[in-house]
Amino acid sequence: MNKQKNNAKSSDATSANVGYEAKLWQMADALRGSMDAAEYKHVVLGLIFLKYISDAFEERHAALLAEKQKGADPEDPDEYRAQSIFWVPPEARWAHLKAQAKQSTIGQLVDDAMVGIERDNPALKGVLPKDYARPVLDKTRLGQIIDLISNIKVGDEASRSKDVLGRVYEYFLSQFASAEGKKGGEFYTPRCVVKLLVEMLEPYRGRVYDPCCGSSGMFVQSVEFIRAHAKGNGNGGKARADISIYGQESNYTTWRLAKMNLAIRGIDGQIAHGDTFHNDRHPDLKADFILANPPFNVSDWGGERLRDDKRWKYGVPPAGNANFAWVQHIVHHLVPAGVAGFVLANGSMSSN
């Protein structure tokens, strides 16, 4: 009998630790109603991001409040920016939104919060979703989602909000990708694939580039790898090596997800929006490491307009399939001793 009880306790503990994101997803998915997964992901992920920056802000705000007698000003934006924390104006703070979650105007209040954050933080300009007031979004459900996200526990110092919420953000990305089927692959590469590429390349230091970065999974995993191997990375045990992140994403809504995904992890990166073939936003970049999962067998990539491009050192790629163009773009952006790891469709390296 005691053994059974112990097993039950162990099972509960495991469920609480391992299944936390899954339980949260089940509850959030139940609130989706008839909304399409592709649309719903921006509603939920935008709110998770808002919760993250508000949590980080409130933690710093409390510390400044405690030091007010020494001259600290909790309402000075520079006090936050000096610590790489986003300034959150009063109308965007989570406590304010949570208190108004049951009001019919909650959609407009969230939109106003997003506008205020972008206004006061230029790095987020054009990144945050601002369509929570639209009529098709049920405001009762929106309030329930806010209540649900409010219950995400930050815990002790080892699992601060950016770690817990980062895990939740990534898990939700994977679930939305699964719900969207083949289309979901445009913004999410399975974690096991990303982890394999990163562990093969070991990007401890230097420039890391992803020319089709989706929601920035390659970069998140690269930084996690560095942190996990901090003691043996030849960098004095620092969790972040001398690593610079560069990426590009052609889909605007996916680019926004990428920017939020990096910000929620506290990662700086130069992530550009634009068509990598026709508007290479990092034309002079020579990277030490390139990780990528390009879209497979794209036929309408406009190759006929790039016949004389300097990137085609090993021959002009076929206009009807972009696979070989991706390979040459990657090789073009590598330093002579650089290393690349990328995923291609079956038969890409043996096709004519």
Question: What residue spans do the PLM features occupy?
Answer:
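A generic secondary-structure signal for well-formed alpha-helical elements
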Residues: 51-64, 176, 226, 230, ...
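Generic recognition of stable, solvent-exposed alpha-helical segments in well-folded globular domains
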Residues: 19-22, 26, 44, 48, ...
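Conserved S-adenosyl-L-methionine
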Residues: 183-292, 297-301, 306-310, 344-347
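Conserved Class I SAM-dependent methyltransferase catalytic core
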Residues: 30, 42-52, 250-255, 318-352
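Non-catalytic, mostly N-terminal accessory regions of nucleic-acid modification and defense proteins
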Residues: 1-204, 270-281
